[in-house]
Amino acid sequence: MSEVAAANGSPSPAPTPEVPATELAQLALEDEPKVSFSDQFKAFSKFGDSKSDGKLITLSQSDKWMKQAKVIDKKITTTDTGIHFKKFKAMKISLSDYNKFLDDLAKTKKVELSEIKQKLASCGAPGVVSVSAGKAAAAVDRLTDTSKYTGSHKERFDASGKGKGIAGRRNVVDGSGYVSGYQHKDTYDNAH
């Protein structure tokens, strides 16, 4: 390629230095769009309220936001947020009032306001953070284990635990003189 460029009279392009993979990964993280505090305020003020326009936030929405951002902990509790929020004497407050609310909360609890705002801005979109899969209770395991069934219910399943279908549910009269489900039929004569 450099011979072609030299023949055309144009200078050859400078070789590009190799960039390590760690630097590329860091650059990729920097290229992600940063969500601002006001954008997060708008998103959380709409969270759980389909009629909201994103300009006012309630105490419960604020608490959800703070819990997701891990601002609410042992130092700052929902009681503290409730006390400071109620100072505004309104059910919903605007972004400017919310900034005053955070400033008052940070001063009272001796926490850096910038740290709180940084956590709130970088907590991600509103939603359920982690949902654990349902776990069967011990009672459910005990009740659904066919090997522990007794009486006539035991006859409804084969050795592997699979149901026998209609044959396991229907009482068929056999006329032998034994009750249904009796397993030692015709063994009395062998024992005596």
Swiss-Prot record:
Tissue expression pattern: Highly expressed in adult head (at protein level).
Region (Disordered): 1-20, 151-192
Record flagged with keyword Nucleus: no
Disruption phenotype: Embryonic nervous system defects characterized by cell misplacement and errors in axonal extension and targeting. Neurons display defective axonal extension. Defects are probably caused by impaired microtubule organization and integrity. During larval neuromuscular junction (NMJ) synaptic development, larvae show reduced synaptic growth and transmission. Severed axons of class IV dendritic arborization (da) neurons display decreased axon regeneration, due at least in part, to impaired axon microtubule integrity. Futsch expression in adult heads is reduced.
Highest taxon in the source lineage: Eukaryota
GO CC aspect terms: axon; cytoplasm; cytoskeleton; neuromuscular junction; neuronal cell body; presynapse
Subcellular location: Cytoplasm, Cytoskeleton; Cell projection, Axon; Presynapse
Major localization listed first in the record, in broad terms: cytoplasm
UniProt GO BP: microtubule bundle formation; microtubule cytoskeleton organization; microtubule polymerization; positive regulation of axon regeneration; positive regulation of protein polymerization; regulation of synaptic assembly at neuromuscular junction
Compositional bias ranges of the Basic and acidic residues kind: 152-161, 183-192
PANTHER family: P25 ALPHA-RELATED, TUBULIN POLYMERIZATION-PROMOTING PROTEIN HOMOLOG
Subunit structure: Found in a complex with tubulin and Futsch.
Function: Regulator of microtubules required for axonal extension during embryonic development and axon regeneration following injury. Promotes microtubule bundling and polymerization. Together with futsch, required for neuromuscular junction (NMJ) bouton growth by regulating synaptic microtubules. Function with futsch in maintaining microtubule stability and dynamics, is essential for promoting axon regeneration in response to peripheral (PNS) and central nervous system (CNS) injury.
Family: Belongs to the TPPP family.
Protein name: Tubulin polymerization-promoting protein homolog
